[in-house]
Amino acid sequence: MHEIGEHLTTNTGWDIIKNRYEAAQAITEGSNFMIGNGFMGYRGTFAEDGKDAYAACIVTDTWDKADGKWEELSTVPNALLTLLHVDGEPFIMSEEAASFERTLDLSQGVTSRKVSQRMKNGATITIHEEKFASYRKKHAVLMKYTVESDQDTDAVLDTGIDYDVWSINGDHLQGHHYFSHPTGDGVTAKTVSYEDTVTVVETCSLDADASEEDYQNPDGSGRTFSLSLEAGKPVTLEKAMIIYSSNDVDNPQDEALLEAKHMQSYEEEKAANRLEWDNLWSHYDVTIQNNIIDQVALRFNIYHAIIATPVHKSLPIGARGLSCQAYQGAAFWDQEIYNMPMYLYSNPEIARNILKYRHRTLDGARRKAKRLGYEGAYYAWISGKTGDELCPDFFFKDVLSGRDIRNHFNDWQIHISPDIAYAVKKYHQVTGDDAFIRDYGAEMIFEIARFLASHAVYKPMRGRYEFMRVQGPDEYHENVDNNAFTNHQAMFTLQAADELLQTLDEKTLSAVKEKIGLSDDEISLWRDMLANTYVPKPDKHGIIEQFDGYYDLETIIPAKKVTERLIKEDEYYGYPNGVTVRTQCIKQADVIQLFVLHPHLYDRKTVELNYEFYEPRTLHFSSLSPSSYAIVAAQIDKVEEAYRNFRKSVMIDLLNTNEAVSGGTFIGGIHTAANGASWQMVVNGFGGLSVHGDDIHLSPRLPDAWDGYTFKAIVKGQTLEVDVTKEQITITNKSEDRKPLTLHIFGEKSVLDSERITKSR
């Protein structure tokens, strides 16, 4: 047993175990111990839990705006609700339980609970409950619920479908229509704003003699089993919950009933699901030698990154995954910058699917640009079903006055578009997938370049183009000019567009130009911008100013001293009147993020100087920030500092270190971008993996806390396994059809033209 945190342990490096029940941790543990499969996320709650315990099943592609303000994914009726009464007394979880253990088995995506509790009649009741969301049947989540008594007693099990579920911003389903089938019940309802049909069907079987009586009321339907528990003889209830919507199939009820009819036993479905998880881990697992806590924390994060990612069709990865409705189940820049790299190097088809979502929603980006007076594609800061902007104008409240704060995430944070162009270019660079560029990528990059050209302001007195009234990754400083990260990303996009204009075959280029109406005058403008756009460069001290006027702001070091200026603990720190706005205190990596994306852009000395300048000015109040600093610290051989940030990042959810409410808005749930970044910290950070031009670069560093680590990466269709120990680095080409690859290991050029190459450290 290895201790992760208070009452939190692991046995094998594949399990998370909590051995104390704490009612106050319902939000956190509901997220941490959740199950999912990219189609749905079922929170890690218990069978008897309702909305007061934040029980919910969140389903992809069910966006709705029930309250007229927030468009978010719907929580669907819960078909696993099971209530136990023993001799008339309800079984209710107590912090005084005789024994309690809950486990998340990362290896196969199973969450479980085993609890023993003494009832008023003297019987000690033991419940063993486990659930999983099937990767074999992505519309199904299954539960096995076993109850045992140490003495003979009467019991009642109420099990069915709970319609009255937890939802952050209104009830999204209406007009619930009940129906039954041979092995259970079902319900069909419609979303409020889009009128999409959602069907939930349950199957139910009990392995004991019991009388059965159906029930139906406005809050749900199901059946009541009345039975006698014999001392020492367990009774098991097996349930499946099957979910379909009209966004998946034409007739959700028929499809759900058909799947229910062919559902196998819990153990058979669990075995099939285990095979699917074996395959998933063969792609994504990163092993750490001789540090089981870091190992399990890393796997915990990778697990949550996996289950948050839709793979059944092109849909976004939500900023809170499918753990809750916070951030609306929609994509931010996180998707391409923090989540996609793991897929890019481990399972490129998923990376392709992520980018296809951005192509599918290109019209939404065009609509946003046009609405705001621009051309081309200005991608939504918060993007859901259609790519239209979901980010409200008023995201936070001023907790001092109670008034809404007008934030400008949705109209000033323009870097979202060049970030997507960056992801397209990086995908092509790593995979060599020319077909994607022809069919999707070129159109996206050209439309983003078109947007940037329409946004840029030409300053005749300075003879240059500038990007004004923007907001960089540091969200506390809005309405700034020439944010260094934004301007660099814009130039990267224009360069990518220019390269495509020169390298695409004539037929493809003509077709894309005709499709989007791209003129020669526009192309000339792009090339003029390439030559004359202002890009902040290192000053005489080697520092890149984050934005115009940043140096004029008040210096507060360390940055967290700014918290002493708060009047109320939960007030918003940022624009327009937060305590950081007139200071150099920044929310998260901004200039430093530039070095994460472009590790070869500046020399090491420049990176070091900027790291040392910005790190003490960074609050790290975004879950995205520690991972960015970890990656860059590893690049410049601040290995132990990188390791400290690695630990901080991978423990954000496990140890619940980030706030659930900011500026009066609920932002709880799993931090999906930090989950994805956990993989990057090892592979791109400590491993130093990058692709620059046609070559692969590796510069592996090893924290003192580890004896070694191993990861896989797919580059140009070749699967590499990188094994790092204290003595050496071994790179093995695991591909069946091996091809020569040019490597740069610590800057020394090598050609991997055999099975493996070994270098001393």
Swiss-Prot record:
Glycerol binds at residues 327-328. Pfam families: Glyco_hydro_65C, Glyco_hydro_65m, Glyco_hydro_65N. Changing residue 475 to A/Q: Loss of function. Substrate binds at residues 333-334, 587-588. Optimum pH is 6.0-8.0. Its EC number is 2.4.1.332. Keywords: Glycosyltransferase, Metal-binding, Transferase. The active site is at 475 (proton donor). One of its GO terms (molecular function) is carbohydrate binding. It catalyses: 2-O-(alpha-D-glucopyranosyl)glycerol + phosphate = beta-D-glucose 1-phosphate + glycerol. GO terms for biological process: carbohydrate metabolic process. Belongs to the glycosyl hydrolase 65 family. Homodimer. Catalyzes both the (1) reversible phosphorolysis of 2-O-alpha-D-glucopyranosyl-sn-glycerol (GG) from beta-D-glucose 1-phosphate (betaGlc1P) and glycerol and (2) the hydrolysis of betaGlc1P. the betaGlc1P hydrolysis is a glucosyl-transfer reaction to an acceptor water molecule that produces an anomer-inverted alpha-glucose, not a phosphatase-type reaction. In the absence of glycerol produces alpha-D-glucopyranose and phosphate from beta-D-glucopyranose 1-phosphate. This is 1,2-alpha-glucosylglycerol phosphorylase.
